[in-house]
């Protein structure tokens, strides 16, 4: 598992920009951002380097932030590869709570998934999927 930053942001003009600025001012690079919203607040899920420092920077700026463990799976950046991964997880009775993807610009995509199930990492590895190690994405802080 790797660390993802989860941030609760009031659904008001400028608040997302303020959160991103707090991260940038701490010298932290964001790799991916996924937003979900309700009427009153949004949830930003951020894949970044130095997630522990980012969490503290956001808390210092007045945001509610926490680290969430997620899977990161490297798959070829070709049509059908994401569907193959999701079908495999379904066949293994793994529930996917949410996910997002980004292109790694090297012929691969990184699929970030919040899952529930037993020994998911081991099952993915045995099936030939490449899990992304934390030190491939961010500095271990």
Show where each model-derived region lies.
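A conserved regulatory-domain signal marking ACT and ACT-like small-molecule sensing domains
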Residues: 1-141
């Amino acid at each position: 598992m790797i660390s993802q930053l989860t941030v609760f942001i009031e659904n008001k003009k400028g608040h997302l920009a303020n959160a991103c600025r707090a991260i940038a001012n701490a010298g932290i690079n964001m790799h991916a951002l996924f937003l979900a919203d309700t009427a009153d607040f949004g949830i930003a899920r951020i894949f970044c380097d130095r997630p522990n420092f980012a969490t503290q920077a956001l808390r210092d700026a007045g945001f509610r932030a926490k680290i969430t463990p997620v899977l990161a799976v490297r798959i070829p950046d070709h049509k059908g590869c994401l569907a193959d991964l999701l079908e495999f997880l379904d066949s293994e009775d793994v529930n996917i709570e949410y996910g997002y993807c980004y292109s790694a610009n090297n012929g691969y995509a990184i699929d970030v998934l919040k899952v529930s199930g037993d020994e998911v990492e081991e099952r993915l590895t045995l099936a030939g999927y490449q899990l992304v190690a934390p030190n491939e994405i961010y500095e271990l802080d």
